[in-house]
Amino acid sequence: MDDDKLLSGDKADDEEASLEKSLRPQTLAQYIGQARVKHELGVYIEAARKREESLDHVLLYGPPGLGKTTLAMVIANEMQVNIRTTSGPAIEKPGDLVALLNELEPGDILFIDEIHRLPKIVEEMLYSAMEDFFVDIVVGQGPTAHPVHFPLPPFTLIGATTRAGMLSAPLRDRFGIVEHMAYYEVADLEDIVKRTADIFQTSIKPSGAHEIARRSRGTPRIANRLFKRIRDFAEVADQDAIDEAIVARSLTYLRVDDAGLDETDNKLLRTMLEYYDGGPVGLATIAANIGEETDTIAEVVEPYLLQIGFLKRTQRGRVVTIKGYQHLGFPYPENK
């Protein structure tokens, strides 16, 4: 490949990366949706800045794709401090955590995604770091082993999780600010889609933005992903603006139905109806039947089906509701 093509490709990649980065809001004012969460965080941030203190530790929990990582970045911008990001599985041993904490300046933010997946020994080390801003680690082995005391600057830990129930009580109780991220309203998702279209310099009609928003499962990440794919279909069709018709055609190709359910969602419901009479059936059994991990079903697939009332949990397992039956066109049994 010649140099011109290499340079051209690099430039295109840089432009695409820049566009992706620009999708992330920088301030609470730019952040669309989650009005209650934004208002509360705005109060806490303003109070901390007035007192010239670090913000209290923050726990953000809710389904994936709702903007927890983005909100952590926004908090750092609003506090005018640096942020270091990592994830629970990436911190395998206490030394990894100490290395991260050692790089923090006073007031900085450490963001840990999937914080429920921290190893127990690392989690326990966080207790003193969060409460008293120090950690003790044992250096050496055998007779020469001795504890070393590491004082830390005041900092803010922001933890994000899709499984708040998996956090231990001692860790959860050390977060002074706990915010639940809820699924987005269609109107807020419309605004997000329109903003994304503006950033990508793509014309979109109100009907097109509404249809994308309506089928995005209340999730901004899905709305943006669908927009980019529909933009591809519109481009190939030489369509000047994205309207409801091109959205509908594109989503048919993408196997996203009228309720916003994708192939996996419908496969789960159909499997439960065809093989288990709508349930109750256990999560592990469902996972084995549709070829998905139980964590994927519990964290990604199931929450929205519960939210829209197509599925419900019972002590004996998951059960498809009458709305779920109706969605797939199955008759609802009289003995249910």
From Swiss-Prot:
GO terms for molecular function: ATP binding; ATP hydrolysis activity; four-way junction DNA binding; four-way junction helicase activity. Residues 185-255 are annotated as: Small ATPAse domain (RuvB-S). Keywords: ATP-binding, Cytoplasm, DNA damage, DNA recombination, DNA repair, DNA-binding, Hydrolase, Nucleotide-binding. Residues 1-21 are annotated as: Disordered. Gene3D superfamilies: 1.10.8.60, P-loop containing nucleotide triphosphate hydrolases, Winged helix-like DNA-binding domain superfamily/Winged helix DNA-binding domain. It holds the Pfam family AAA_lid_4. Residues 1-11 have a biased composition (Basic and acidic residues). DNA binds at residues 313, 318. Mg(2+) binds at residue 69. HAMAP family: DNA_HJ_migration_RuvB. Has 3 domains, the large (RuvB-L) and small ATPase (RuvB-S) domains and the C-terminal head (RuvB-H) domain. The head domain binds DNA, while the ATPase domains jointly bind ATP, ADP or are empty depending on the state of the subunit in the translocation cycle. During a single DNA translocation step the structure of each domain remains the same, but their relative positions change. This is Holliday junction branch migration complex subunit RuvB. The lineage of its organism: Bacteria, Bacillati, Bacillota, Bacilli, Lactobacillales.
